């Protein structure tokens, strides 16, 4: 790890302003319904408290338009954090200003202050320097533990670093370490499994990882763009017709780079995307009938993928194999989740839908790393330089 981390600095009696990612779902009852991201930040928060720091937390929730919106308040998150951590969590219903300064002044060592949703301030997403400076003036050190927003240059994760030193929290450190390994230094054989709806969302990842991977397994709705590009009949399946040439180019590039692209050989098809409808298995070389659409990979494909993954030393998986939210079309995603879980090497699950899928199947702890950032992990795998990582101070050589 070339970046400074929270372990590299003395925190005793220091005020720490920490950017965490508490962008979690809130249920109809107004309570947190999935606290994965909150528990992921706990080790960093607790470490700072143990080291006798005063901890000020910053997070966004949802997409309020730069002004107060009660449904995006962090108040229920403060209550949840207090309940699960046993820490003295104090909620301040302001983002910045005199009330915040006063609350910080009254903090004792070991207190954890959670400020209101950073995106209630119009300056947050613009990386407004005045706002960043106001936050920086509350503390001695900035800790960035919000990998989920690493691909965004906002005031709370990037701006503050212009005024006080910024270091990585434990979650950020783990994300950087694992994603660095699979992007730049993978052990071989290296297999990349991609799914999800659109080729356009994954084009950067495919282009970058074709330089490193030995095999690329493609499932999800994006497979139909590749299959149609090869001249196969895909019925009413989702296809990006404007990306057919691109799919052909990718297949050509893979051939040149000697990367084996493994496409599905069968699919579970139905006439509607809903539970309980008639479904059947279609052999893809015979094509899918009009009016039917592919909604999951089929049983033969599962066997083909299992064979392709057999001796893998590194696996990255990003994107589900089908419409896994509906039980009828979750079989392929579940099978892939289970086969990757058995692999002895380094296994990394990209954030977003793939992370949601492995959580649904109760397999989160079976992998080397499940990323907490959907968009951020994709951009990292594309080889991009992320602003929320660049702004963290480097270790001295």
UniProtKB/Swiss-Prot annotation:
Pathway: Carbohydrate degradation; glycolysis; pyruvate from D-glyceraldehyde 3-phosphate: step 2/5. GO terms for biological process: gluconeogenesis; glycolytic process. It is found in: Cytoplasm. The gene is pgk. It comes from the Bacteria. Substrate binds at residues 21-23, 37, 60-63, 119, 152. Belongs to the phosphoglycerate kinase family. This is Phosphoglycerate kinase. GO terms for cellular component: cytosol. One of its GO terms (molecular function) is ADP binding. It is an enzyme of class 2 (transferase). Its EC number is 2.7.2.3. Keywords: ATP-binding, Cytoplasm, Glycolysis, Kinase, Nucleotide-binding, Transferase. Pfam families: PGK (PF00162). It catalyses: (2R)-3-phosphoglycerate + ATP = (2R)-3-phospho-glyceroyl phosphate + ADP. Monomer. ATP binds at residues 202, 294, 325, 351-354.
